[in-house]
């Protein structure tokens, strides 16, 4: 790890990742980190990140290089051999500058292997050409010509010295050419290849070696004969004329390559002695695995007194198995002592392998030999057969007695059925347990005759077996109790499984029903939401249309306001919201007619519809007095605003009492200024006459249409009621109507803001402010 102070310094060892202190071992580093840097919790995350990065880099490096990147020594193994310590918990050493030579190594290795293989193949091919003809019966000149045709020889003048030993060539030190590569060497460096070795290398099997080998052609015999001939010769010419027709001259390098090839062939075809012995050992073990189970079955049957197997055959099989065990022991001992007396002692790994084979064979013999059962003698086998025969007879007797006892109990039960009473109760058999006898069967009594059967057959079976268990316990039949308890457990498990499946099926059906209901509810909500949106859009459009129409009609109908004042209840019926009409049927009272803002109720709320005129006409007492049935222009029609409504929106006449007029502020002054001399109420000093009080003089407006209910006698005029009683009724209803009107106008303001109609927002805001002022004044006025 590089130090922070000196970037060029490289430090190695067990360094602390925080203080860079060099510790001597892994455990010292761990203890130092736990003691000194225990409080540095923030560094833990950084260390984990570094460890993860190093691990990724290591995995990438190992993935790229594979198994070829192996560090020498056993330090890597020892660092992982400590149990309970994870080296990845600590920060590893930083990977220094490195360079992979794997590609170069593979390239050089492939070239070297190719060179070796190609060269060896060339030598074998040339050797095969040199041995393809009969060298003993061919002339020397022809042999020399054939050898030169196989490989070109190097020129003698080009090589003055021997390439191997460096001696100078002369008359005594002649030049010799290698018949396989064509190079030149001296006689000392020359090698000879015998024909047997040549045929062995060129042939596909060793049979060629025995075919071409003879005592006269062996290398030792030939060499010895040549040596004798050389010793017998005294002249130099005889040495120069020496013929080696039965052998092939070659250099040391070619001879070494051919010898390595021969060694590879021998190793490939040779089987070591330990392998042969181990194969025999495995065959013996497999034979024991086949014979031992068969012998165990035979011994168990014979010891039980059965006559299925023959005693003599079992004895023969036992002897055979024992002999195989002895052979296994002998082979394992031979493997253990193999090669111990040889001069070059075997490799320690070979000796260890031999010891483990011996140990494995010993364990095998002990395990199998201890499992062998002894066979009875002939006398013992006869006694066992007699004893088994007696047991079988006794068993048959017991079974016959059990059958007779069960038949007797069945007859008793059938006879006991006749003693039943009228209501079906059993008196003779109930409550009296059967006597317990030795060597007899037992049969439980059914207790479900006087009880209603359960619709579920499993429950009925459980009840019956429970009753049988009680009877078996009372009778002391432990075997039957265990059997019945096992049957009861199985029935209970089956019943529990059945109930679980039913519960799962029921829950699944309920879930499907809930899902269907949820989908239907969502569909209904979606439809309701769409309907509300449509109504909201329609109401918004109607509100905007009415406000715009009102703003356009008000200037043109100001003059018409001086005409006859139609009863305010008409405009109330025309512009009142359906909430007021539906919730208060008696809202058309004299007190409600004087409501100041009832004339401007705005459009209907969301999800509501305006009542048609036919519905409003049905609420009147007399159908003949319905003003909506006539075509008089003075009567207001649907979608038009009456003069009384305009007058009520702009401000009531001056004759109305001041404390009950919510629009007597600036709106009245603006109206007086606009009307001028044509307005009968232009005189501010004179008291404003009340248009609702009857006057003896003629009215300035045109007479009302015949049949108008607003021109009836004073006794039926709702505006001529007693002032005290009218104020009391008006005060309670006005407050409720004003609050409802305030809520409606707030909703209209919200809708106008959402739609971006700021002109309507200003108008509605002014109306809302006036309504609030009126409500405050009415609450503060004395009763």
UniProtKB/Swiss-Prot annotation:
Residues 99-262 are annotated as: Necessary for the correct targeting to endosomes. The modification Phosphoserine is found at residues 3, 214, 218, 225, 229, 686. PROSITE patterns: ZF_FYVE, ZINC_FINGER_C2H2_1. GO terms for molecular function: phosphatidylinositol-3-phosphate binding; small GTPase binding; zinc ion binding. It holds the Pfam family Rbsn. Residues 663-673, 721-733 have a biased composition (Acidic residues). Residues 227-239 have a biased composition (Low complexity). Residues 627-783 are annotated as: Necessary for interaction with RAB5A. InterPro entries: Rab4/Rab5_effector, Rbsn_Rab-bd, Rbsn_Rab-bd_sf, Znf_C2H2_type, Znf_FYVE, Znf_FYVE-rel, Znf_FYVE_PHD, Znf_RING/FYVE/PHD. Gene3D superfamilies: Rabenosyn, Rab binding domain, Zinc/RING finger domain, C3HC4 (zinc finger). A zinc finger (C2H2-type) spans 14-37. Residues 495-514 form the UIM domain. The modification N-acetylalanine is found at residue 2. Residues 206-223, 571-584, 610-623 have a biased composition (Polar residues). Residues 263-783 are annotated as: Necessary for interaction with EHD1. GO terms for biological process: early endosome to Golgi transport; Golgi to lysosome transport; protein transport; regulation of Golgi organization. It is a lipid-anchor. This is Rabenosyn-5. It comes from Mus musculus (Mouse).
């Amino acid at each position: 790890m590089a130090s922070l102070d000196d970037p060029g310094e490289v430090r190695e060892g067990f360094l602390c990742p925080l203080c860079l202190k060099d510790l001597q071992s892994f455990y010292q580093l761990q203890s130092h980190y736990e003691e000194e840097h225990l409080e540095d919790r923030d560094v833990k995350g950084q260390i984990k990140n570094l460890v993860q990065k190093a691990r990724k880099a290591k995995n990438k490096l190992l993935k790229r290089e594979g198994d070829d990147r192996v560090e020498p020594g056993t330090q890597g193994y020892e660092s992982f051999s400590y149990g309970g310590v994870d080296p990845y918990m600590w920060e590893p050493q930083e990977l220094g500058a490195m360079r992979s030579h794997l590609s170069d190594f593979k390239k050089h290795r492939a070239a070297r292997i190719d060179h070796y293989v190609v060269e060896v193949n060339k030598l074998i091919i040339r050797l095969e050409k040199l041995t393809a003809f009969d060298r003993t019966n061919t002339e020397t000149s022809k042999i020399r010509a054939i050898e030169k045709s196989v490989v070109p020889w190097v020129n003698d003048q080009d090589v003055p010295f021997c390439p191997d030993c460096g001696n100078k060539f002369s008359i005594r030190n002649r030049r010799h050419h290698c018949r396989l590569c064509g190079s030149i060497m001296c006689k000392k460096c020359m090698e000879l290849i015998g024909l047997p070795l040549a045929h062995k290398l060129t042939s596909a099997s060793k049979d060629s070696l025995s075919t071409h080998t003879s005592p006269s052609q062996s290398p030792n015999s030939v060499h010895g004969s040549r040596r004798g001939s050389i010793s017998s010769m005294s002249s130099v010419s005889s040495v120069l004329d020496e013929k080696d027709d039965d052998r092939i001259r070659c250099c040391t390098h070619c001879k070494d390559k051919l010898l390595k090839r021969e060694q590879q062939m021998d190793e490939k075809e040779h089987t070591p002695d330990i392998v042969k012995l181990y194969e025999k050992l495995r065959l013996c073990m497999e034979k024991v695995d086949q014979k031992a189970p068969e012998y165990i079955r035979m011994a168990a049957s014979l010891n039980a007194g059965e006559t299925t197997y023959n005693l003599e055959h079992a004895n023969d099989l036992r002897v055979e198995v024992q002999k195989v065990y002895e052979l296994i022991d002998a082979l394992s001992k031979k493997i253990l002592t193999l090669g111990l007396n040889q001069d070059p002692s075997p490799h320690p790994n070979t000796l260890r392998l031999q010891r483990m084979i011996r140990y494995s064979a010993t364990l095998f013999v002990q395990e199998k030999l201890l499992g062998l059962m002894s066979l009875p003698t002939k006398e013992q086998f006869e006694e066992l057969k007699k004893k088994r025969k007696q047991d079988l007879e006794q068993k048959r007797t017991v079974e016959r007695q059990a059958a007779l006892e069960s038949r007797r109990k069945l007859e008793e039960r059938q006879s006991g059925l006749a003693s039943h009473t009228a209501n079906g109760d059993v008196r003779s058999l109930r409550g009296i347990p059967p006597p317990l006898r030795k060597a007899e069967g037992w049969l439980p009594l059914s207790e479900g005759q006087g009880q209603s059967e359960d619709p579920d057959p499993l429950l009925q079976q459980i009840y019956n077996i429970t009753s049988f268990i009680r009877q078996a316990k009372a009778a002391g039949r432990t075997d039957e109790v265990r059997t019945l308890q096992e049957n009861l457990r199985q029935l209970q498990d089956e019943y529990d499984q059945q109930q679980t499946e039913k519960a799962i099926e029921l829950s699944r059906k309920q879930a499907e029903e809930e899902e269907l209901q949820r989908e239907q509810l969502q569909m209904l909500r979606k439809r309701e939401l769409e309907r509300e949106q449509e109504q909201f859009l329609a109401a918004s459009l109607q509100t905007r249309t009415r406000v715009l129409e009102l703003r356009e009609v008000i200037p043109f109908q100001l003059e018409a306001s001086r005409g006859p004042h139609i009863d305010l209840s008409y405009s109330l019926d025309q512009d009142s919201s359906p909430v007021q009409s539906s919730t208060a049927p008696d809202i058309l009272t004299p007190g409600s007619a004087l409501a100041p803002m009832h004339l401007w109720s705005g459009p209907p709320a969301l999800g509501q519809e305006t009542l048609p005129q036919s519905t409003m006409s049905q609420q009147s007492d007399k159908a003949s007095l319905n003003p909506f049935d006539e075509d008089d222009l003075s009567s207001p029609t649907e979608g038009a605003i009456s003069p009384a409504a305009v007058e009520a929106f702009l401000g009531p006449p001056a004759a109305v009492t001041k404390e009950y007029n919510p629009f007597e502020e600036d709106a009245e002054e603006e109206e007086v200024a606009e009307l001028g001399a044509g307005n009968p109420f232009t005189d501010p000093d004179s008291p404003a006459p009340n248009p609702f009080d009857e006057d003896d003089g003629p009215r300035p407006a045109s007479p009302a249409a015949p049949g108008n209910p607003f021109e009836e006698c004073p006794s039926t005029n709702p505006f001529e009621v007693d002032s005290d009683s009218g104020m009391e009724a008006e005060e309670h209803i006005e407050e409720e109507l004003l609050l409802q009107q305030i809520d409606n106008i707030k909703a209209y303001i919200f809708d106008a803001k959402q739609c971006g109609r700021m002109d309507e927002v200003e108008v509605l805001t002014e109306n809302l402010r006036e309504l609030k002022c009126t409500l405050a004044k009415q609450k503060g006025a004395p009763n």
